[in-house]
Amino acid sequence: MANDMKNRHTSSVLRRIVLGAMVVIGAFMFVLPLATNLPGKSAATGNLMTSFRPHMTDAALAQTAADQRTMAAMGQQLNTTMLPALATQLHMTPAQLSAYLTANFPSVGAGLAQFSTILSRFGGLQSTMAAQESNFQQADQIPTGFLPPTSMTALFLIPGGLLMVLGAIGLARPRAARAMIALTTAVGVVVVGGLLAVSMSSKTSAADRMTTAFAPVFATQSVQQMRADTNTVEAMATEFSQKTLPAIATALHMTPAQMGTLVTQQFPAVAAGQAQLPQIVERMATATGLVESNVNNYNQSASIPWSSGSMVTMFWLMMVPGLLVVVAGAGALVFGGGRRRVASLPIPRAHAGAMHS
């Protein structure tokens, strides 16, 4: 009997320790997202993904790549073939024609001087987006395809709150301790099983790779350079179509229509680029605006859970507490003994003679 009482006492102490641990783990899971401003950061992540989603499709990326090829072909033919040919017809050297364009059409002159560099920078953005398409698609499923990133906070608060409440009930009502341990263990199983079921580890790894790849794009200097490049190309495109070509046509004693025919026949890449230039410049401006408007969203998203930023860290901050709950709870259920049993004492029977005394 003494051994039974000792075992019951040991089991009771073990249960209380485990229940106390459940409360502590639950408090950690509940406080963590609030302390790290996860609601605000996850909302910023959702805004970022929503903004970029239309631009990270196969069709959108293919269009961006086509724009890049069109502009590259136009720039190469313009600088290596068309301008030298026009210089010859105008009885100028290429250097003289360049000086003439710079003096009379400054936007065209500035644009031509920077064209290859600007094209290279936008090509870098296009390459980054294309290379990160797969990572984006995975990250866009955090936590699941039907739950938005803002639900990440609830994935901490709900299990954390349950662990605190169930653990507190078990501590306050010793007779319910075993049942509360079983329920908290079930919470841990749901957390761990849920993370594994939705492949959260691979999704968060993809998110970290994407965040790292886009860091140079969202750097302050890069964003400012994108805006300057876009303004340069917009001004060049407008002045080239509206002023430069008509002026050259006049100098060559041609009508604008004749000049257009000449360009189409002899410089098809330039003609194709000129025809598509308004749409290409518009898409370029859209890309620039996309980056500019999401700098703050990116910075907040990249700081999950804290300044150094790592979605993988956030995954482990959910997985480790879940595993601890499962291990501690299962251990208490296995080694903590069964339910308390009330010992039954034998009741002595009365002797027959005692009834007659």
Residue spans of the language-model regions?
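Juxtamembrane interface at the cytosolic side of transmembrane helices
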Residues: 2-26, 151-199, 312-357
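Extracytoplasmic/ectodomain regions of membrane proteins and secreted proteins
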Residues: 29-152, 197-318
